[in-house]
Amino acid sequence: MNILVYRWNSYNYIDIIATFQSMGHQVDVIEQELESYDEDEVFAARLHGILQQKNYDFVFTVNYFAVISGVCQQMGIKYVSWSCDSPLLSMYHKNVFLDCNYFFLFDKTNYLEFKGMGVKHIWHLHIWLISLQRKICGEESSG
């Protein structure tokens, strides 16, 4: 798979990217400070251009960015976001209802709330599963 990762100042991207790559996936990374999580015309244009250049299977982020969701919807590309914050205020945006979105939330209350509001592709994913996997496999974090 070809995966585009939007990387911002979050602690867990090194492990996520390494995991995707260890599974045989091609990972490209885009980094840019956003004016707003909801709207940023300059970033949206840049992302649109990148998505036109290569056939990506999905865009991945830690936490949710409505601006990315909007571009993915326009381009017909899946947007996968994994939330490790609670409450994730950026999810209280109309774009959460777009069909391109695939949410993985660690907070069960938030999961139930958004599922109840009609968000289509949403799952509850415990953060401790990653820690448990490392303990079982004897792996240490790479960063």
Predicted regions and their residues:
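Catalytic core of nucleotide-activated saccharide and alditol-phosphate transferases
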Residues: 81-143
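Well-ordered mid-protein domain cores that form the structural environment of catalytic cofactors
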Residues: 68-82, 88-89
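Residue-level detector of anion-binding/catalytic polar loops
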Residues: 26, 78, 120
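N-terminal pre-catalytic "stem/leader" segment of glycosyltransferase-like enzymes
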Residues: 1-75
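Short, structured secondary-structure boundary patches
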Residues: 42-56, 79-83, 98-106
